[in-house]
């Protein structure tokens, strides 16, 4: 993904890379994830798999540009090979009703770190501010991946949500309250049931839970 800073360039291709010190402290793989995805999609092609389920955490941390980049990769694979994808959001793909800022450190071509943030309040020499780093909330965070199950598609034989047949976000809302009852938020449930071809049913349950804090 391109976050708008001078990163590492190899053979004319820009690479967004995290440091080893950050990678080793995480349970996730940062720098190898793109190659792993392309390798998995190539195996999908070779095996003739027609339907692929993405069970959450399909982005790094839901950054706008990361989600858009993934969308492009899946669209190209779908259009070229006819593979259908069905997504569910993980806790790293979307956050609550309004989203949240992210700040990450990346490597520059000289091996030094640069902070990239969506939070305009972050100041300091060398800090790159960009809204590409922002993680969207419901339903905006679903829109880029909307064609991958979240919303009804013309070729589906059947599609519905726990709230009925409408795929409109305003028809898929529910209230959540803080334990003291003082804070109430309206959230969208991204769950859906789809029959993409006769006899194949996929029950996709949005397991994200966002609990308002007291006060």
Each predicted region: which residue ranges?
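N-terminal active-site segment of His-dependent metallophosphoesterases
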Residues: 1-67
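Extended active-site neighborhood of metal-dependent phosphoesterases/phosphodiesterases
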Residues: 69-215
């Amino acid at each position: 993904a391109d976050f708008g800073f001078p990163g590492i360039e190899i053979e004319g291709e820009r690479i967004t890379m995290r440091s080893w010190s950050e990678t080793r402290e995480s349970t996730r793989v940062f720098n190898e994830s793109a190659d792993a995805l392309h390798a998995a999609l190539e195996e999908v092609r070779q095996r003739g798999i027609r339907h692929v389920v993405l069970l959450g955490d399909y982005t790094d941390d839901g950054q706008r540009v990361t989600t858009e980049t993934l969308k492009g990769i899946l669209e190209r694979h779908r259009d070229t090979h006819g593979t259908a994808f069905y997504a569910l959001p993980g806790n790293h793909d979307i956050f609550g009703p309004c989203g949240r800022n992210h700040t990450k450190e990346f490597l520059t071509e000289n091996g030094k770190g640069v902070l990239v943030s969506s939070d305009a309040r972050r100041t300091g020499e060398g800090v790159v501010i960009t809204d590409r780093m922002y993680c969207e909330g419901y339903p905006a965070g679903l829109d880029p991946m909307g064609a991958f199950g979240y919303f009804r598609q013309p070729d589906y034989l059947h599609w519905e949500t726990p709230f009925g047949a409408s795929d409109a976000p305003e028809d898929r809302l529910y209230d959540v309250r803080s334990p003291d009852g003082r804070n109430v938020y309206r959230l969208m449930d991204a769950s859906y049931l789809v029959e993409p071809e006769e006899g194949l049913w996929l029950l996709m349950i949005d397991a994200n839970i966002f609990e308002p804090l007291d006060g």
